[in-house]
A protein has these predicted regions:
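Long amphipathic alpha-helical coiled-coil
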Residues: 28, 32-46, 50-57, 61, ...
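Active-site helix/loop of acyl-thioester processing domains in fatty-acid/polyketide metabolism
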Residues: 160, 175-208, 335, 358-360, ...
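Structured N-terminal alpha/beta-domain signature
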Residues: 134-137, 143-226, 230-249
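Short nucleic-acid-contacting surface segments enriched for D/E, G, S/T with interspersed K/R
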Residues: 215-221, 417-425, 606-614
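Extended low-complexity, intrinsically disordered segments associated with secretion/export
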Residues: 52-79
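Short tryptophan-centered beta-strand motifs in secreted/extracellular beta-sheet-rich domains
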Residues: 222-228, 424-430, 613-619
Length: 658
């Protein structure tokens, strides 16, 4: 979870950028000096626009029963008002809590579901356990949860989930009797298919129909498409039902909703002082019970922080407080181990978390990389690191609401792995906590593993800041203007422009598209820059309706710094393609190089009203081998008048497809 950088769409204005001091970010300065520079580095011009507030909490956790009645049919599916259609997948996405290979259900399968046999039908990914605190024994969770008992459903086919956009998946039903009852049963089946019940150890599925019930049709077949699904305030979905395969309309079709509601007395989150119990019922990939689940991550991002972290955090709900990103930028799922104690900030607190990388993730479709893009490595590791550091409660002693900003770090990819469809095991250790008036600092070590193999590790520092501490943003250069390299030249060099937007095509494997189309053009000075090996420059507008403001963060919109890094990477990638480095391979792919430590430093943030941002890249080294070419560079990013990001040894590899 970082802050600030750019996206692209449409025409962008151009300007220039500037050099930087080559000070390794990984070497953390004394905390007092860091604090002094950081507190001056931010600006309190964050508009508290709630573009993401479509997920407003409904009243209470037990919604009033819904009645079948008149329905207003919208022309389009409700979504975030600021989101462009091409970027909807990144903002309004839902990742199933469990995935099953089941695509068809027989009448026997449905009968098993009516008797609570969810794992029996959908497999071990849907397994839940809990602890009987009276005996200490492991018992089955949600053993009383039954679904699909409302209507006579003969069979279900075409069962599939989609992670994004206006359609989250659906199914087709053959039934006898009442189509409304059959649709309610089918919607409940979809809910357990994607694992909504896994958020709680003991819940009930409450389904209701909305709209005009159709006359009993001659057909005994209906289709159901899920148009809304979420974990906040409680796991729920809304589906549109059409009879006999016809599209929903005012004359044919209706809506069905399902809420998964905790039974009376079932705790939803940690207790006072962050006491963690074996009540979630969620099973981690390791087979152990998860301490916190996807449900708690969603509430920490944009719901009730008291549910997420315990009653002490309730005062942050609805405020511009520290949060995880939401939507497609939420890249941590579960907490599986935790050795710390709330209120104790001594170094050494360890914790482990998990993130499931969907094989069909939006960023895999939009990236130019052969596997996940660089920002995913950064976001999933940094979100995991800060998560339990915040849980320890460093902000609870302040009378002000504090917001989180990443300040810098260093990280290295040690092994090239394809992460698609894998569960990333994230290990984090709190190195230090320093509490100061109006702010506090925490530093962490972290590493990522898949199937026991470490592939990424690093260190990072976060700061928690009050509004007053964010009032003065002085950037990396103590408030002075730092000119870009072009501005330091006595005479204008020869500049050529790479028109990235003109070649952008989803059929082009070496081009970022959709929400990751962060670059429209790159200005190039061949043989230029600080190292005489090439200079890249880009300026782009920042628009208030950029998709990432919907995701990062709720009530506190700033551009993720990881997307600033991603923008620099895309400039380098476009330059590598432009000069023909890819032509020697039949199936060239971009990757993150192994064993090239990358350092970053953030001393500011990009906010919706900044207007534009600027970046420059100094090509530092070109390493050519028989099977690959690696470009290493340094870069800086500016907001108007201030240089706020510095990247040292950012690198891109181009090689034959693996």
């Amino acid at each position: 979870m970082v802050e600030a950088a750019p996206r692209s769409a449409g025409n962008r204005t151009r300007e220039s950028l500037a050099p930087r001091e080559t000070v390794p970010v990984g070497a953390m300065a004394p905390l007092a000096a860091v604090r002094d520079s950081v507190v001056r580095a931010h600006q309190a011009t964050i508009a508290a626009a709630s573009a993401v507030a479509r997920a407003t909490l409904r009243d209470g956790l037990n919604p009033a029963p819904r009645q079948l009645g008149e329905k207003t049919w919208p022309e389009t599916v409700d979504t975030f008002s600021t989101t462009r259609a091409a970027e909807l997948a990144a903002v309004r996405c839902f990742r199933p809590l469990a995935r099953s290979a089941k695509r068809e259900l027989s009448s026997e399968d449905i009968d098993v579901l009516t008797r609570g046999g969810i794992e029996q039908v959908f497999g071990p990914t849907h397994r839940q356990t809990a602890t009987d605190h009276a005996t200490g024994r492991t018992i089955a969770a949600n053993s009383m949860l039954t679904v699909a008992s409302h209507g006579q459903v003969e069979s279900i086919e075409g069962l599939e989930s989609s992670p994004r956009g206006a359609d989250f998946g659906g199914l087709t039903v053959r039934y006898n009797g009442d189509p409304v009852a059959a649709a309610r049963s089918a919607a409940e089946v979809f809910g357990v298919f994607v694992g909504l019940h896994l958020c709680m150890s003991d819940c009930v599925a409450e389904s209701q129909a909305h709209g005009t019930a159709p006359n009993p049709p001659s057909s005994q077949r209906l289709s159901l498409r899920v148009v809304e699904i979420d974990l906040v305030p409680i796991p729920h979905l809304r589906a549109r039902v059409s009879i006999d395969g016809l599209e929903p309309s005012r004359d044919n079709g209706f809506d069905v909703t399902v809420d998964f509601i905790p039974r009376n007395g079932v705790p939803l989150g940690p207790g006072t002082n962050g006491h963690l119990q074996d009540w979630t019922g969620r099973v981690a990939t390791t087979g152990r019970q998860a301490l916190l689940s996807e449900f708690h991550m969603a509430h920490l991002a944009r719901g009730d922080q008291g549910i997420a972290f315990g009653p002490e955090f309730s005062r942050y709900t609805g405020n511009r407080a520290t949060r995880l990103p939401t939507g497609g930028l939420l890249l941590v799922d579960r907490v599986t181990e935790f050795s710390g104690t709330r209120g104790n900030w001594d170094a050494g607190a360890d914790y482990r978390t998990e993130y499931d990388v969907p094989a069909d993730a939006w960023y895999l479709e939009d990236t130019a990389n052969g596997s996940v893009p660089h920002f995913v490595y950064m976001e999933t590791s940094l979100q995991a690191a800060l998560l339990m550091g915040y849980y320890l409660g460093p902000t609870l002693g302040s009378t002000e609401t504090l917001r989180l900003r990443n300040l810098g770090g260093t990280a290295t990819v040690s092994r090239r792995l394809d992460l698609r469809g894998k569960t990333v095991d994230q290990s984090s250790t709190l190195v230090s906590t320093t509490l100061m008036p109006g702010s506090s600092l925490q530093s962490f070590d972290y590493s990522l593993r898949v199937d026991g193999d470490e592939f990424y590790s690093g260190t990072t520092m976060f700061g928690y800041f009050s509004d007053s501490a964010l009032d003065n943003q002085t950037g990396l250069d103590a408030g002075r203007h730092r000119p870009n390299w072009l501005e330091t030249l006595e005479s204008a060099p020869q500049i050529r422009t790479i028109d990235v937007a003109a070649r952008r095509d989803r059929r082009e494997p070496l081009c970022c598209t959709g929400a990751l189309a962060l670059v429209d053009h790159v200005d190039v000075v061949d043989g230029g820059g600080q190292y005489g090996k090439g200079y890249l420059h880009m300026t782009r507008d920042i628009e208030a309706d950029e998709w990432f403001f919907d995701c990062h963060f709720y009530l506190d919109p700033v551009i993720p710094g990881s997307l600033g890094v991603e923008s620099v990477i895309q400039c380098i990638q476009e330059w590598m393609v432009d000069v023909g480095m890819h032509r020697q391979w039949r199936d060239p792919q971009f990757h993150i190089p192994e064993n090239v430590p990358f350092n970053w430093k953030y001393r500011g943030q990009f906010v919706p009203d900044d207007g534009h941002c600027e970046l420059e890249v100094h090509v530092k080294d070109i390493r050519t081998q028989a099977d690959s070419v690696v470009v290493v560079a340094d870069a800086s990013l500016w907001k108007p008048g201030l240089r706020i990001y510095e990247l040292i040894d950012i690198s891109v590899e181009l090689r034959e497809g693996i």
